[in-house]
Amino acid sequence: MYSVIIVAAGSGRRMNLDINKQFIKLREKEIIAHTIQVFYENINIDEIVVCIKKEEEDFFKENIINKYNFKNIKIAYGGKERQDSIYNGLKKLDKNCDIVLIHDGARPFVDHRIINESIKVAKEKKAVVVGVPVSDTIKIVSDGTVKETPERNLLWAAQTPQTFEYNLIIDAYEQAYKNNYYGTDDSMLVENIGQSVTMVMGSYENIKITSPEDLNIAEQILNMEKRDEVNSRRRII
């Protein structure tokens, strides 16, 4: 059984808006609805859990689930930190779950190739992150001074989904809470217990929408986007 947790319990702070950025519309459709739609249409995904703020539950049900006729969507409440929200989502998953994908609700341009490849590799390697090679030269800076310039060919920008064997990610989260450890993404928790993580090529279009500038880029992506309907219909054995 393949499940996805979509994290949508953030805010619109960097957008300078009073509403959750997930509810901002792209082409008359909310960002979170775009994101859910991709996983909803993917034949390999058996279960969808969306993490939202408790106070936004009624709005989410009326304006997303009911409006777009999504069926069997589970809801988990957001926590203080992103990690807490995901842990709440993990507790909502069916116990028959084999592989779980964890995805940012504000990344609506994830495609079926990424989803399917993540599941396929996770079945063999247990832990998978999607990402892209960085195009800029990265500097490590301390107190305004450049301390080091890492080799660019070794650097990747991590994206989501991040995909894990169910028992592994549960163990990683339980160990993290036991040791009061908070990571900036889920793969850090898995790395923290000694599990290697495999990188799968993501997409430069798989952006996270967090600023007004990102919204402009998202509109441009929509203008040229073509959904890969064929890949969405290929069930992974």
UniProtKB/Swiss-Prot annotation:
Database matches in CDD domains: CDP-ME_synthetase (cd02516)
Site (Transition state stabilizer): R14, K21
GO terms of biological process kind: isopentenyl diphosphate biosynthetic process, methylerythritol 4-phosphate pathway
A molecular-function term among this protein's GO annotations: 2-C-methyl-D-erythritol 4-phosphate cytidylyltransferase activity
Matches recorded under Pfam families: IspD (PF01128)
InterPro entries (alphabetical): IspD (IPR001228), IspD/TarI (IPR034683), IspD/TarI_cytidylyltransf_bact (IPR050088), ISPD_synthase_CS (IPR018294), Nucleotide-diphossugar_trans (IPR029044)
Marked site: Positions MEP for the nucleophilic attack: R152, K208
EC identifiers of the protein: 2.7.7.60
Reactions the enzyme catalyzes: 2-C-methyl-D-erythritol 4-phosphate + CTP + H(+) = 4-CDP-2-C-methyl-D-erythritol + diphosphate
Top-rank taxon: Bacteria
Enzymatic class: transferase
Record pathway: Isoprenoid biosynthesis; isopentenyl diphosphate biosynthesis via DXP pathway; isopentenyl diphosphate from 1-deoxy-D-xylulose 5-phosphate: step 2/6
Keywords from the UniProt entry: Isoprene biosynthesis, Nucleotidyltransferase, Transferase
Stated role: Catalyzes the formation of 4-diphosphocytidyl-2-C-methyl-D-erythritol from CTP and 2-C-methyl-D-erythritol 4-phosphate (MEP).
Family label: Belongs to the IspD/TarI cytidylyltransferase family. IspD subfamily.
Protein name from the UniProt record: 2-C-methyl-D-erythritol 4-phosphate cytidylyltransferase
Species per Swiss-Prot/TrEMBL record: Clostridioides difficile (strain 630) (Peptoclostridium difficile)
Lineage, broadest ranks: Bacteria, Bacillati, Bacillota, Clostridia, Peptostreptococcales
